[in-house]
């Protein structure tokens, strides 16, 4: 499946595997708070995050309404990120794709998750068939757009390289 997404969309398979490993431990951990409650709490408890959280809560309600999902049924992080790819609602609404062709963009089904991550990276500057992952490269910046932390990108890139090295060695 990873190779199918990689071949179809042109995104490095090791990067895809690295991202879902960092974000959700390959789907094992994707949050313990309901996304609705997490965002609502941010609005009222952290004034400096209130405007952002209000926008994300609105995006989440749009997502749930459009897919006939109970807004209290999806668990995520304290910041409202959810699913195997830990998308925030606005990112999910803007970048998630229906890779498996079942007419639904799933946050918890691997074909759609991997396809959506690849789509996010591509829409944020990832260059297919470019093996430059050095700091400041377009591929590095596409991961930085996913999570705006230099440390995060560094860890993702280190894990990507380690996975690649181990697979190539075997």
Model-predicted segments: where are they?
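Catalytic glycan-binding domains that act on GlcNAc-containing polysaccharides
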Residues: 1-170
């Amino acid at each position: 499946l990873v190779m199918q997404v990689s071949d179809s969309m042109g995104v490095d398979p090791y990067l895809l595997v690295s991202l879902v490993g960092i974000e959700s431990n390959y789907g094992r951990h994707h949050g313990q708070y309901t996304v609705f409650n997490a965002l609502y709490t941010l609005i009222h408890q952290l004034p400096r995050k209130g405007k952002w959280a209000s926008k994300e809560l609105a995006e989440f309600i749009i997502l749930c309404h459009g897919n006939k999902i109970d807004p209290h049924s999806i668990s995520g992080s304290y910041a409202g990120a959810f699913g195997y790819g830990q998308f925030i609602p606005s990112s999910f609404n803007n970048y998630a794709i229906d890779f498996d062709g079942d007419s639904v963009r799933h946050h918890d089904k691997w074909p759609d998750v991997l396809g959506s991550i690849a789509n996010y990276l591509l829409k944020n500057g990832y260059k297919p068939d470019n093996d430059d992952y050095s700091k400041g490269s377009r591929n590095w910046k596409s991961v930085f757009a996913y999570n705006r932390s230099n440390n995060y990108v560094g860890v993702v890139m280190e894990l990507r390289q380690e996975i690649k090295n181990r697979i190539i060695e075997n």
